[in-house]
Amino acid sequence: MVMTDPIADMLTRIRNANMVRHEKLEIPASKLKREIAEILKREGFIRDVEFIEDNKQGIIRVFLKYGQNNERVITGLKRISKPGLRVYAKSNEVPRVLNGLGIAILSTSQGVLTDKEARAKQAGGEVLAYVW
């Protein structure tokens, strides 16, 4: 079966594993998914990311992060730009998520960036997802 939206699949896998408090999960790899996972790690939403080569497309292993009392670090994940309705933002219209408590992930001409990085570099692009 052909997957029409691999980014939504990745976010759903993370959301589902987070809801049942799994320690780790595996996602089929792609370059864009790898960059999104690196952003989530850099911003402190996940604990670690491993990239496993398997002579096919590879696997991304994501280690989820929880607080002291096993509370979730990721409260929500939302796919914004979908295959049926693409959402773009100009450099001066980059969205803020929960007044800066969350992040927006954008695909720009300068690579995959968070909303803060896109504002600093004055780059617009496709709004992939919100994470808070």
UniProtKB/Swiss-Prot annotation:
Region forming the signal peptide: none
Keyword Ribonucleoprotein belongs to the record: yes
Alphabetized UniProt keyword annotations: Ribonucleoprotein, Ribosomal protein, RNA-binding, rRNA-binding
Domain of life: Bacteria
Classification via InterPro entries: Ribosomal_uS8, Ribosomal_uS8_CS, Ribosomal_uS8_sf
Entry GO terms, CC: ribonucleoprotein complex; ribosome
Single biological process term from Gene Ontology: translation
Gene Ontology molecular function, alphabetical: rRNA binding; structural constituent of ribosome
Function: One of the primary rRNA binding proteins, it binds directly to 16S rRNA central domain where it helps coordinate assembly of the platform of the 30S subunit.
Quaternary assembly: Part of the 30S ribosomal subunit. Contacts proteins S5 and S12.
Xref: HAMAP family: Ribosomal_uS8_B
Family designation: Belongs to the universal ribosomal protein uS8 family.
Protein name: Small ribosomal subunit protein uS8
Organism whose genome encodes this protein: Bacillus licheniformis (strain ATCC 14580 / DSM 13 / JCM 2505 / CCUG 7422 / NBRC 12200 / NCIMB 9375 / NCTC 10341 / NRRL NRS-1264 / Gibson 46)
This protein's encoding gene: rpsH
